[in-house]
Curated annotation (Swiss-Prot):
The lineage of its organism: Viruses, Duplodnaviria, Heunggongvirae, Uroviricota, Caudoviricetes. It comes from Escherichia phage Bf23 (Enterobacteria phage BF23). Pfam families: DUF7177. It comes from the Viruses. This is Uncharacterized 9.2 kDa protein.
Amino acid sequence: MKNVITAPKIGQSVFIPFVTKTDELTGKTERIKGAALIPFDTIDAVYAENERSNNGKTVFSVRVKSGDVVKVVQRNEKWEAVL
């Protein structure tokens, strides 16, 4: 039987498979796929608002220890950041 988790909790681990950087000239945030130096981070805060993905999964907004706010979805009983 699978362990069902309905919402992320503070202290849980999040897999972040990408790094974002801000271009100094344009000010736009760019995604660098597969370049995460530390691909795992810990949830520091969970925000109340959530969304639905195209396939019906709930997407939660969380802040991780590094200070970034990312959206996470549950995949294979673990939390993974998505864009």
